[in-house]
């Protein structure tokens, strides 16, 4: 997992596909977009623009992906995201791996939380369990952009 703020340069060299996704986040005015999918580089790099309401932690299931990494970016609002390493010990609640590249767990072993503010992003790789859209202080409307980057595009 990588955690940062879009206004701060990343001191590390990242794969081209991740840099392209971060450039999209840096240069797009998300107040001008409607919720939905935006293709950045076909199905290899695309963004989901989501308007959500944060919920209690127990109402959101932890998740992982295998074919895509997630770059979760908060355009406005506030949220907490649960994070953990996928130890292989989490009980599967629902597997939609073939249809949507997502596995939901009942719970997440050794979970910690990060706090997201507008401009924050978190990059989740296949080994990173994450539980997005959790209440930080109180229920809040958020706009979140999830950029999906195909693992096959990482160089």
Predicted regions, residues:
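A short, N-terminal "cap"/entry segment at the start of jelly-roll beta-barrel domains
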Residues: 1-49, 61-64
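Short beta-strand/loop turn elements enriched in aromatics
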Residues: 40-48, 80-96
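A short beta-loop-beta micro-motif enriched in histidine and acidic residues
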Residues: 42, 58-70, 89-93, 109, ...
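Short acidic (Asp/Glu) patches
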Residues: 50-67, 98-110, 131
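Glycine- and acidic-residue-biased ligand/ion/polar-headgroup-sensing regions
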Residues: 67-69, 73-81, 88, 97-102
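Conserved metal-binding segment of the jelly-roll/cupin
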Residues: 114-133
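A short hydrophobic beta-strand segment most commonly corresponding to one strand
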Residues: 121-123, 139-155
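Short proline/glycine-enriched turn/loop segments at secondary-structure junctions
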Residues: 134-138
